[in-house]
Amino acid sequence: GVWDAAYLQKVDYDLWLGPAPAVPFNRNHFHYNWHWHWAYGNGDTGNQGPHQFDIARWGLNKNEHPTTVASVGGYFGPPASQETPDTHTSIFEYADGTVFEFATRGQYTNDEGTQRIGNLFYGTKGWVWIDGDGRKWQSYSGRRNEKGPGSEAPPSSGGSDPNVLTSQEGAHYKNFVDAIRANDAKVLTCGVEDGHLSSALAHLANIAYRVGRKLKFDGKAEKFVGDAEADKLLTREYRAPYAIADKV
């Protein structure tokens, strides 16, 4: 382990651990690095993933859980304490046959439509990339990938809009605080369930990766079909006094 007392001068380490097991301090498991250890984090699929899952679900119009998930990958970087994969591909299938693929490429890889982080949507006549923030986009059509409407296309192509989403972080935060103060979820411009559905994709992907097999998921019950081992990973063992009740 890596020990440096200076890191803990202003930190309540027991509180920082929360429900995770009480283990000696290790700087490699601490701020930000916690993402890469199962006791605290969910890898980059749970770190960057939900940002992109939101956009993907909007584009696919999916307000439900997938019915199956398959996931493969591994850690292929230099020797480290990291437990989560740095290379990770997951495929989700929905009840209507829609297939959604998510990939984390921790090592060398190609760009996709000039984007290293973002979403790609494929249709019958072409495809579209959307950047990681959802603010730039570009469409292409036909076998020659001719540019259509988008952030990089001239107006003569059928219209050019520099933004898919308008930046409204300030109003977004204010809306969240207003909803808390009003104790009324209806005040929210984006419901809590949206965050749950996007975050669940990361958890489903990681569980399929950890058990090493394709899984069927019952979205209504929020349980795996006939897989007790996978079901155990839907929650965790909570360390007292940081336990959370099954019903909150």
Label each residue range with its predicted role.
Residues 1-248:
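Contiguous beta-strand/loop segments that form the cofactor/metal-binding neighborhood of enzyme cores
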